[in-house]
């Protein structure tokens, strides 16, 4: 309704979209619903972590390093999980889901690849070691997201 088009850097969308997603669905205003949809579509156009003008390249290398807690930063794991939780199932999510699958270690766990250790009183987990939080989120993505079938016409 006369609102300006969404112009925002995709890496700034993660924290904002997370905040809007925290609002229970029945309590989301029409404006919040539209904002979620616009933000999700922008991320999907980027295949969640790619450059929009070159989908063969990662937009930001840090997006492919899974971390916990994310705070103001984000990564492909957090974004794909967020979109799944919001009910999105789109073939443009497949690369991110496959990235998650590819990072699984032989023992079935995922490593903490990025961390804010040193920024808190206590370190959550050790970088380079198996992470219960990354593993939990990755398993949720693989269980709930799966690979979305691409429709052929």
Where are these regions (language model features)?
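A structural feature that tracks compact, well-ordered secondary-structure segments
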Residues: 99-103
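Acidic carboxylate motifs that coordinate Ca2+ or other divalent cations, activating on Asp/Glu
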Residues: 107
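An alpha-helical repeat/solenoid feature that recognizes helix-turn-helix modules
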Residues: 1-95, 111-150
């Amino acid at each position: 309704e006369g609102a300006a088009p969404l112009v925002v850097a995709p890496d700034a969308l993660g924290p904002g979209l997370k905040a809007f997603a925290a609002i229970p669905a029945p309590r989301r205003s029409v404006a919040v619903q539209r904002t979620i949809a616009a933000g999700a579509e922008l991320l999907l156009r980027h295949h969640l972590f790619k450059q929009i003008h070159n989908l063969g390249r990662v937009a930001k290398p840090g997006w492919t390093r899974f971390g916990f807690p994310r705070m103001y930063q984000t990564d492909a794991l957090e974004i794909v999980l967020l979109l799944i939780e919001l009910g999105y199932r789109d073939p443009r999510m497949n690369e991110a889901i496959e990235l998650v699958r590819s990072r699984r270690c032989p023992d079935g766990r995922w490593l903490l690849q990025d961390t804010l250790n040193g920024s808190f009183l206590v370190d959550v987990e050790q970088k380079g070691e198996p992470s219960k939080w990354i593993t939990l989120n990755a398993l949720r993505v693989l269980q709930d997201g799966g690979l979305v079938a691409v429709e052929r016409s």
